[in-house]
C-alpha cells in the first residue's frame, strides 16, 4: 500500500511564507542595529510578548502536512529567529558608579588644590616673619656694635682723666693772667733813721722838754704797702721763703732807732712786731 502524498501547496501560500520570513529577518536586523547604536539605553527587560509577525512559526501538525516539504525543511533548518549577542549589562549600579567617580575625583582634586594653596600661604607668611626677624637682628647687632665702640671710648676718656687728676694733685695751681712773678718789685723808700721826723716847739725854761708826736706820713704809706702785700700773697696762695722775707724786712725797715741824749725815743720811731706768719705788722 503506497502512502498518499499530500497535495502540493498553493503558490500563494509559498509567497506568503517567504514574505513572512523576510519580514522577521528585517525586524531582527533593525533591532540589532538600534541596540548597537544605543548601548546605554539598553536595560534588562523581562520577556515580553513578541508581535504576531515576530513570533515563531508554530503550526499545527495538520497545517504542517499541507506545507511543502522544501519550504518546511528550509524553515526548520533556519530554526527560530536568533537575536544577535547583546553585551551583558554590568548592573544597574555601574552607570551610577561611573557617574560618581568623576565627581569624587574632582572633589579630591579641589581639596588637594585648597590644601596646597593654604600651605603656600603659610609658608610665605612664615618666610616673611623670618625675614623681619633677621632685619631686627641685624639692626640690634649694629646698635650693639655702636654702643660697644662708645663704651671703649668712654673707658679711654675716664682713664685719661684719672691719669691727669693724679698728675695734677702734686702741682701748684696756675697763676692768674694779670700777675707775673718774674717781674722785679720796686723797693719802698723809707727815710733814713738819723733824719728828724718832725720839729717840735722849744722847751720852756724850768721844765722838761716835751715833744709832741706828729703823724708821720711815711708810716701810713708803709702800712698801705704792707696791706697790699698781704692781699697779694693771700691771693697767690703761696708762702714766701723765710730768708727772702727776712732780707726784705732788713733792707726796708730798721728794728729800732737810736735814742736821744735825753733818753726819750724819737717821735718818728714806730714799734714793729713780727707775728708768726712772717708778715710785718705796724702798731
Curated annotation (Swiss-Prot):
Residues 103-126 are annotated as: Basic motif. Gene3D superfamilies: 1.20.5.170. InterPro entries: AP-1-like, bZIP, bZIP_sf. Disulfide bonds: none annotated. Residues 55-67 have a biased composition (Polar residues). Residues 130-161 are annotated as: Leucine-zipper. GO terms for molecular function: DNA-binding transcription activator activity, RNA polymerase II-specific; transcription cis-regulatory region binding. Residues 1-121, 178-283 are annotated as: Disordered. Residues 102-165 form the bZIP domain. Keywords: DNA-binding, Nucleus, Transcription, Transcription regulation. Residues 26-42, 108-118 have a biased composition (Low complexity). Residues 1-10 have a biased composition (Pro residues). Belongs to the bZIP family. Putative transcription factor. This is Putative transcription factor kapC.
